[in-house]
């Protein structure tokens, strides 16, 4: 946003949300080229002279609005040219350009809300690991958890209808609808592996924006009821008028939807629940009875079906007791087990024993799924026995060692917050031995002979990062004490999951 504030008349667009004229600005097409286009594809276009041709973009938009426009068959869509340009190239340009201008209302609202609340923007809030300190603080005091899979809209029109709540410009929405139907060919947008099935990889930014806008609208309704009701529940009885206003607001929301959804809302006068989401999976946790959790389940199902017209089933939401269920979330197995302990105590002449059962969040490394990810990447077989990586055998020794060490360190970095670190030793063993077998395969030698020649220097490369980090925490302690330290370390610079950890 900061790059374009000198060009855009933000005050006018803030008032009217007229975004359609922006797509015909030359600097938008140039910014779309700089942000998203592949340079290799540009070189293949003979009519492209290192500048974004706004005239051709206008012609392509005009063709989409025409009833009898020339259709390019799917068999030769990558080779055909129309007026000397590549259709995929300029469809990508329109996609990137629309993504840039459609993000303007969201960015303006975010900046204004941060400035109005005087909130300091912290980059640590982007870290995935910032979720786990929250879970450690809240989960030991809760009883039940609901594992929710957010349903995906299977039709493009649902995403367009969702976007109209934020973008008031009808022309932009019409252009988006024409563009999606022109280039999707009726394909389903989302698939079962919880990732976006992109009909063209070049349009990933646009589809991610549309999906995030759908999630934003869903959470705006859900979190409004949760936050407002929780606030009123914690305040004194002097805010009776605020409580009446909230219940009236909930009634207004219910009138918008069908009668079934109105019946569900009436049960949720005082919800008090914790909510965490990452990608297409969310967690609801509460201290109340299972009855309230079941009410929340049917509330969410009714919200998706009645408001967003997305099919959902109560069976997609699993309610379990935290002390008896392990939660699979963000590559960790998390639960809150009861750890009974006997504490002897004495008061005057009477002695007695106190049964204490403290609850603490356990975050465990999922060994079996991780081994499955390593086997899929050809580092080991299905049983976890290390094998060589033949596709890397043509690299230099330095590159081979560096790749294995980087994978091992990234996994150690991500799973540093595990409460039980013994599982990581097996993962490191698989990667180390796979590295040795790959090097031995390259040099056509046995593993024993190669290790004898190389020595123990190779194994030290896999453990240096953790020891260097602990030396910063305990600079004055001995090396032995640092090796014995097994506390949790949550890094606040992890903005994406490790590819091997993302086994869901």
Swiss-Prot record:
One example GO MF annotation: RNA binding
Any coiled-coil regions, as ranges: none
Localization terms from the record: Plastid, Chloroplast
GO biological process: mRNA processing; RNA splicing; tRNA processing
Cellular compartments per GO CC: chloroplast
Classification via Pfam families: Intron_maturas2 (PF01348), MatK_N (PF01824)
Keyword hit for Chloroplast: yes
Keywords: Chloroplast, mRNA processing, Plastid, RNA-binding, tRNA processing
Keyword RNA-binding assigned: yes
Similarity remark: Belongs to the intron maturase 2 family. MatK subfamily.
Function according to Swiss-Prot or TrEMBL: Usually encoded in the trnK tRNA gene intron. Probably assists in splicing its own and other chloroplast group II introns.
The name this protein goes by in its record: Maturase K
């Amino acid at each position: 946003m900061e790059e374009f504030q000198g060009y855009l008349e933000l005050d006018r667009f803030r008032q009217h949300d007229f975004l359609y004229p922006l797509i015909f600005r030359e600097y938008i097409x140039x910014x779309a080229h700089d942000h998203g286009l592949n340079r290799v594809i540009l070189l293949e276009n003979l009519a492209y002279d290192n500048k974004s041709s706004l005239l051709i973009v206008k012609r392509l938009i005009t063709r989409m609005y025409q009833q009898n426009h020339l259709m390019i068959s799917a068999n030769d869509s990558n080779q055909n040219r129309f007026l000397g340009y590549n259709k995929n190239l300029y469809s990508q340009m329109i996609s990137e350009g629309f993504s840039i201008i459609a993000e303007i209302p969201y960015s303006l609202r975010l900046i204004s809300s941060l400035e109005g609340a005087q909130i300091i923007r912290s980059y640590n809030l982007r870290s995935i690991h910032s979720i786990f300190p929250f879970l450690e603080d809240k989960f030991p005091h809760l009883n039940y958890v609901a594992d929710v899979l957010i349903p995906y809209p299977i039709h493009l029109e649902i995403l367009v209808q969702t976007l109209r709540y934020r973008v008031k410009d009808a022309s932009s929405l019409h252009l988006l609808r024409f563009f999606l139907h022109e280039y999707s060919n009726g394909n389903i947008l989302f698939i079962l592996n919880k990732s976006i099935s992109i009909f063209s990889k070049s349009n990933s930014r646009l589809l991610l924006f549309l999906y995030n806008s759908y999630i934003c609208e869903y959470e705006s309704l859900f979190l409004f009821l949760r936050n407002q009701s929780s606030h009123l529940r914690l305040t004194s009885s002097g805010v009776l008028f605020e409580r009446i206003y909230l219940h009236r607001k909930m009634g207004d929301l219910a009138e918008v939807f069908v009668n079934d959804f109105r019946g569900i809302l009436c049960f949720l006068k005082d919800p008090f629940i914790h909510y965490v989401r990452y990608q297409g999976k969310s967690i609801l946790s509460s201290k109340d009875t299972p009855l309230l959790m079941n009410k929340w389940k049917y509330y969410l199902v009714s919200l998706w079906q009645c408001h967003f017209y997305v099919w959902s089933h109560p069976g997609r939401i699993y309610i379990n007791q935290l002390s008896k269920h392990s939660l699979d979330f963000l590559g960790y197995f998390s639960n809150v087990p009861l750890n009974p302990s006997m504490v002897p105590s004495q008061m005057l002449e009477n002695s007695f024993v106190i049964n204490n059962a403290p609850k603490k969040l356990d975050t465990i490394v999922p060994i079996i799924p991780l081994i499955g990810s390593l086997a899929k990447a050809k580092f080991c077989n299905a049983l976890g026995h290390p094998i060589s990586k033949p596709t890397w055998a043509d690299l230099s020794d330095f590159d081979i060692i560096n790749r294995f060490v980087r994978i091992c360190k990234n996994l150690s970095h991500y799973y540093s917050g595990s409460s039980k670190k013994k599982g990581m030793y097996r993962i490191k063993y698989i990667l180390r031995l796979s590295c040795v077998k790959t090097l031995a395969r390259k040099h056509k030698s046995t593993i024993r002979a190669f290790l004898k020649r190389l020595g123990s220097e190779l194994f030290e490369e896999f453990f240096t990062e953790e020891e260097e980090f602990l030396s910063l925490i305990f600079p004055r302690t001995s090396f032995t004490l640092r090796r014995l330290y097994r506390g949790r370390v949550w890094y606040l610079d992890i903005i994406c999951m490790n590819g091997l950890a993302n086994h869901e």
